[in-house]
Structures are given as structure tokens and as C-alpha cells.
């Protein structure tokens, strides 16, 4: 018997949802659900928001000249920004784990969109 992947178990899904919501409503106070990784979720969400300009500059430095971050889908922007935050500011987390977890979270959002 294999374990089913549940987005509720992936703190990155919550991170993406919080940052995406924040994109559309900057005035709303952020609240965080009870979760065993609540501290991690808060840290990534708040850190990504606080370091938004640094993260955007870092991303822009690595994009092709014909590609701009602001032209990309908003969910994709949030996923990339939060992953870059973890790469830069969470050195204890393996790069492999960060990539794997954000790929899983991305699949959740892609599959959710395709069923709409």
C-alpha cells in the first residue's frame, strides 16, 4: 500500500496559497493555520514578502533577456520566488528537497487549474 500525496501535508502548498492571496490583497493581515510546520510556513511567507526586491533581482539576473518575471503567470511567480527564498535563506534545507517539494506543490496547482 502506497501513501497518497496530499497537498495538506505539503507546507509549500500553504506558502504558495498565502503568497498568492497576498499578491491580490496586500492590506489583509496574514493568518496561518494550525500545522506542524507553522513556524516554517510563516518564516518562508514573511521572508519572501520582506525580501521581494532582492529575490526579483536574483531571478532577473538569471532569466534570458526576452523573459521577464512580471510577464509570467502569477502562481508561477509565487512558486519561483518562494523557492528562491528557500535556496538563499534556508541553507540547512537540501536543494534537492526544495526542488522536489515545489514540484509536488506545482503539480497540485497545475492539476487544480486543468479541472476548472
Task: Explain the meaning of each model-derived region.
Residues 1-116:
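N-terminal interaction/assembly modules
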Amino acid at each position: 500500500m502506497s501513501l497518497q500525496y496530499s497537498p495538506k501535508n505539503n507546507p509549500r502548498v500553504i506558502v504558495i496559497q498565502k503568497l498568492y492571496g497576498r499578491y491580490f490583497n496586500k492590506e489583509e493581515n496574514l493568518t496561518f493555520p494550525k500545522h506542524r510546520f507553522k513556524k516554517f510556513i510563516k518564516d518562508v511567507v514573511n521572508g519572501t514578502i520582506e525580501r521581494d526586491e532582492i529575490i526579483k533581482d536574483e531571478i532577473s539576473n538569471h532569466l534570458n533577456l526576452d523573459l521577464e518575471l512580471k510577464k509570467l503567470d502569477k502562481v508561477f511567480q509565487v512558486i519561483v520566488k518562494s523557492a528562491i527564498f528557500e535556496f538563499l535563506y534556508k541553507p540547512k534545507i537540501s536543494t534537492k528537497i526544495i526542488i522536489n517539494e515545489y514540484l509536488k506543490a506545482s503539480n497540485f496547482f497545475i492539476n487544480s487549474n486543468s479541472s476548472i
